[in-house]
């Protein structure tokens, strides 16, 4: 976290309070806020022409790295093969509406659709309400190119109840039709991190391991890229680079094959 950006955010809020009676750090939207970004991006994705190869740009934790987000957008826009961008949570740093707006203003310059999951930083203050207004549900799924993506909330520490992640919902989503060739789960906190609900870790990973055609579990949160099989159960977990590292993970998926590369920018 960079002190300069924190001071900028605080200064902006003070100026807004001085200049307008309308602004509150607790508000979930204003007249300039984008709405239903998930629905709009999914519509854009479904309108695109798919082929036998699915290409994903995967990154996470934008927080207050605005310059790095701009660099990411410029680089991805040069990658014509990319079908979809996945952002693994922590869109904001303090859950503030203005932070969400600053990041989405930049991400909306992408030439390809993007999907952003909710992170633990996004739940600070009124951030959950901001996310729901700006993006939509915290848990949802969609199918593209015979691949089912299951987007879900794993920010267990931010909730006092033990129902995050929502295991019954997740089990139902993993029970897929035969025409689905592969399943990719996307969330912020990985199950092997201390911020995940320890009481649900075993059931969560076993659910993935027992699901036919489960391909990948993608996460952010830990602020470094990892790729492996932490439970030795055949399930591959990948965590993203963060925006400040100026690199993203590029995944090419076709047939029963997966090719991963790291793209600097």
What do the PLM-derived regions correspond to, one by one?
Residues 13-16:
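C-terminal motif of bacterial Sec signal peptides marking the signal peptidase cleavage site
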Residues 46-56, 141-151, 177-184, 230-236, ...:
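Beta-strand-turn-beta hairpins that frame and shape the catalytic cleft
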Residues 21-37, 43, 59, 226-265:
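Binuclear metal-dependent phosphoesterase catalytic core
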Residues 20, 77-84, 159-234, 261:
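His/acidic metal-ligating clusters that form di-metal
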Residues 69-139, 143-144:
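Core catalytic region of metal-dependent phosphoesterases/phosphodiesterases
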Residues 2-9:
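Sec-dependent signal peptide recognition
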Residues 18-102:
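N-terminal active-site segment of His-dependent metallophosphoesterases
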Residues 58-61, 84-90, 113-120, 152, ...:
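Active-site neighborhood of phospho(di)ester-bond hydrolases with catalytic His/Asp-centered motifs
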